[in-house]
């Protein structure tokens, strides 16, 4: 379903989002999303590996 989105469709969706949220709010949303993804990747990378205990 989503695999068939082309460049025109993505641009249309971004244009609608720009109209709804405005340029400043859209930039803030993108910044927050980027920081969240960066934090998630950092947490995955820094997670200590748990040792399996033999019973």
UniProtKB/Swiss-Prot annotation:
InterPro entries: TatA/B/E, TatA/E. Disulfide bonds: none annotated. GO terms for biological process: protein transport by the Tat complex. This is Sec-independent protein translocase protein TatA. GO terms for cellular component: TAT protein transport complex. The keyword Signal does not apply. Forms a complex with TatC. Part of the twin-arginine translocation (Tat) system that transports large folded proteins containing a characteristic twin-arginine motif in their signal peptide across membranes. TatA could form the protein-conducting channel of the Tat system. Pfam families: TatA_B_E. HAMAP family: TatA_E. Keywords: Cell inner membrane, Cell membrane, Membrane, Protein transport, Translocation, Transmembrane, Transmembrane helix, Transport. The chain crosses the membrane at residues 1-21. It comes from the Bacteria. The gene is tatA. PANTHER family: SEC-INDEPENDENT PROTEIN TRANSLOCASE PROTEIN TATA. Belongs to the TatA/E family.
């Amino acid at each position: 379903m989503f695999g068939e989105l082309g460049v025109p469709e993505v641009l249309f969706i971004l244009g609608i989002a720009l109209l709804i949220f405005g340029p400043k709010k859209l930039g803030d949303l993108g910044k927050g999303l980027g920081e969240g993804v960066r934090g998630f990747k950092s947490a995955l990378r820094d997670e200590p590996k748990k040792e399996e205990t033999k019973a």
